[in-house]
Amino acid sequence: MRRDEIQSLLDNIPVTPESMCSYFADRPSQSRAFRVDGDLPPELFDVALDRGYRRCGDIYYQQTCKHCHLCLSYRVLVQSFVARRSQRRVAVRNSDVEWRVVEPVLTSEKEALYLRYQHSQHYVKDIARPDAERFAAAGYDEASLLDTLEFQMYTNPRSTRELQLHCDGQLLGFGTLDLSANAVSAVYFVFDPDHARRSLGTMAILAGLDWAREREIQYYYLGFYIPGHPKMDYKRHFKPAEIRDPVAGKWIGAPDAEIAALAD
């Protein structure tokens, strides 16, 4: 199948009904999505990434909201990337951290770290109560969260890899990297909340970019950049980069002025 035929197929997948947006509670969300049982050929995955698709478990999806276009696919130009001063400081701060890219294997250590990370990011802190009690008070239980972990980070194509950060034998963070023919797509990253001052999310991106550069990979996809969003705005600091205009369906350079224009 030719590239243009694949593009046409992806662009004509039916749009899902409206559901609650994960980023803005007052807005509906819609997407195109398809499920893959097994591996997606790298060349086809390249086209899907280029069309703004991402993967979660065995589902590939593209945001197609009618009245909001703030979820901007963002990719760093790997071979041209230059770390900012603040990013270089993060690298120095983590000079004692060893990073490695390996095949993903779920362990009890990762399960425990995932639960602690989710609680620190999404639930009210109450250090006087055990984790299980805090999750229950927030309306979640550990079993359902661990099911999400397995689906989100360990239901993967065979080409998927895991980025790990270690210090003195301790696992500080781990994340899922999807590989296509000419790109890396960062799916999800988890870090130890006790080491928040290390800026491990930034460190993981820097490590992933180094790994991609060594392999002469062209693009490093950071997922959705949402201008001004407290959890999704940081991606604009990794440049040079391109953003995908969700209306025109084309990739453009990502200086701040053009990002602001798309956000309006």
Model-based region annotation:
Residues 1-106, 214, 218-264:
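Terminal substrate-recognition subdomain of acyl/acetyltransferases
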Residues 42, 108, 202-206:
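A structural signal for well-ordered alpha-helical segments within the folded catalytic domains
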Residues 163-244:
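Aromatic (often tryptophan-rich) hydrophobic motifs at membrane interfaces
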